[in-house]
């Protein structure tokens, strides 16, 4: 009798596993994120005018364009900080408006352009806040929480600073802490708003190389907003160029970044050349 019950339990477990696998397969071919006919206005000022785009899973996609093009508003909508007037945003086929903030934070991590923390908080304690979406109120750290904290500190090269106050770090180091906190969420998608702002060139490159590492070694889908065209070309698999609330160009940097597209996006004349096989944009 026990053997029969055991077999029934096994069959039930196998059926449940099969259902979960089938459900996962349903979304397997969906883009990491998709925007469909997105509109948004501030009062009578139309900022986004029917934006549609797809974010390829496992790639680095950069959104760029001149000030006022709508990229910051698009970022806010993609991170659930604003709600669209019309249109939808899908995360692996699921409308993000149907996800509460905690559910969304288990799937998407965000690094804002401006961040602040109390002066006395340590690196490790700030990074640990990334586990909040996975916890109940007043719940202590689980073994998985501790593992993720250690991993996030390790991958961002912050182990030696773990007990130091964040306020005592350089700008580049602080940015790594915020990225580590986002990584601690354990998501497959990371969205960054101008992650190199206010950093000198050394730390800009350091942060972008870290972003590239996260993508190449851990398969994290990266979506970021950048101003520097050459950095976007160097570190992106895909570029989305916006102007006046619409997408003008979308695709491989090698194909979409041209003198003509730069003129359309920014209203300036820049030359496009190659050095050692790599494309660069130069003033003319």
What function would you assign to each model-found segment?
Residues 87-95, 104:
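Conserved ABC transporter NBD signature motif
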Residues 33-35, 48:
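Conserved structural motif at the start of ABC-family nucleotide-binding domains
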Residues 79:
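Helix-to-loop junction immediately C-terminal to a conserved catalytic motif
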Residues 64-66:
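The feature captures the beta-strand-to-loop junction immediately N-terminal to the Walker
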Residues 190-194:
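Catalytic Walker B motif of ABC-type/P-loop ATPase nucleotide-binding domains
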Residues 165-169, 173:
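Conserved ABC ATPase signature
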Residues 128, 143-161, 186:
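Conserved ABC ATPase "signature" region
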């Amino acid at each position: 009798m026990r053997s029969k019950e055991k077999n029934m339990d096994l069959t039930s477990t196998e059926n449940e596993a099969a259902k979960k696998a089938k459900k996962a397969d349903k979304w397997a071919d969906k883009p990491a994120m998709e925007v469909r006919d997105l509109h948004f206005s501030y009062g009578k000022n139309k900022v986004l005018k029917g934006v549609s785009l797809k974010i390829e899973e496992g790639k680095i996609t950069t959104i760029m364009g001149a000030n006022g093009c709508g990229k910051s508003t698009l970022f806010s909508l993609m991170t659930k900080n604003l709600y669209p007037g019309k249109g939808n945003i899908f995360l692996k086929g699921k409308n993000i408006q149907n996800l509460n903030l905690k559910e969304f934070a288990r799937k998407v991590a965000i690094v804002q352009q401006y961040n602040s923390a109390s002066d006395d908080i340590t690196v490790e304690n700030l990074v640990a806040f990334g586990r909040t979406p996975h916890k109940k109120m007043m719940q202590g750290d689980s073994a998985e929480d501790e593992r993720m904290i250690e991993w996030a500190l390790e991958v961002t090269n912050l182990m030696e600073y773990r007990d130091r106050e964040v306020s005592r770090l350089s700008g580049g180091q602080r940015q790594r802490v915020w990225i580590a906190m986002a990584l601690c969420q354990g998501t497959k998608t990371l969205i960054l708003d101008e992650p190199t702002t206010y950093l000198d060139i050394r730390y800009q490159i350091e942060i972008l190389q870290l972003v590239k590492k996260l993508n190449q070694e851990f398969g994290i889908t990266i979506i970021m907003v950048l101003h520097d065209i050459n950095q976007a070309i160097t570190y992106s698999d895909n570029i989305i160029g916006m102007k006046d609330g619409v997408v003008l160009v979308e695709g491989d940097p090698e194909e979409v970044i041209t003198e003509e597209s730069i003129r359309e996006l920014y209203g300036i004349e820049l030359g496009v050349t190659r050095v050692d096989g790599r494309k660069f944009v130069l003033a003319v």
